[in-house]
Amino acid sequence: MDGFIVIDKPAGLTSHDIIARVRRILGQKKAGHTGTLDPFATGVLPVAMGEGTKAIPFLDEAVKEYRATMVLGAATDTQDCTGRVEKEGDWTRLSVEAVREVFGAYIGKCKQIPPMYSAVKQGGVPLYRLARKGHEVEREPRDIEIHSLIIDRMELPRIEFTVSCSRGTYVRTLAHDMGERLGCGAHLSALRRTRSGPFDLSRAVTLDELASIKEQGAVDSLLLAPNEVLGHFPEIELSDEEVRKVYCGVPPRCHGRCEESSASQNDGKKVRLVQNGKLLAVAEIGQAESGNGNKSLRLIRVFN
């Protein structure tokens, strides 16, 4: 079984728990996920199986989309509803305009300090382990990007919003930081991921639904092939001879098939090597060869 299945993760389970249950339901040994979700969060968790696991590293930069609810007036140690209230503040004098102004200030590229309750490692130790012992350490701010931040509903102290963001963005930290900026504190009370790169809720199934579909022998209807999942990479169709060479570790030549093959800006760009819709490999465009200007390709990952 090779490809991806999108699980609608329930609250209360870790992403690792989901992988263990999917393996058990499908009898699949080789499985992994892309894009960890906090235990209290729900929604899109892409699970890769078999050869699909080879595609995971190429999905790291995928844009994520979430629906979230934040509550003003209380900041917690975990920055969400599972934590202990550390600080309370008065939100009653806040205007709708002030809230909208703060939301607008976070759109674009910015720095974010990862929360103590996270899997980010410092000195080889996950921060959450230090946090559970009552330790707080300095963390380096990380570059993130908020592509869009839309208020869906505002009934203070509750604000429901939709955010589209880059990898590595902690939505609960975003809520916490906006609460600090508003001067009253805030925490996240609900978080649901609606999209992760090419995966969205329209293709998601619950664990119970997956078990039922497995009993019906229809799991293949859920599978997203690696070639579809990596559709954001340009495609190069290979001949039979080129396929044989790829499986021997020899990459094909571009021969004009790489977009703007004479442009140096394409150096390092990744492409899919396919035949008849089947993904054979992911390759990287190299520099042009001297004399003929033809670009070279370097194999990164070969799929069986």
Curated annotation (Swiss-Prot):
The lineage of its organism: Bacteria, Pseudomonadati, Thermodesulfobacteriota, Desulfuromonadia, Geobacterales. Keywords: Isomerase, tRNA processing. It catalyses: uridine(55) in tRNA = pseudouridine(55) in tRNA. HAMAP family: TruB_bact (MF_01080). It comes from Geobacter metallireducens (strain ATCC 53774 / DSM 7210 / GS-15). Its EC number is 5.4.99.25. CDD domains: PseudoU_synth_EcTruB. This is tRNA pseudouridine synthase B. InterPro entries: PsdUridine_synth_cat_dom_sf, PsdUridine_synth_N, tRNA_psdUridine_synth_TruB, TruB_C. GO terms for molecular function: RNA binding; tRNA pseudouridine(55) synthase activity.
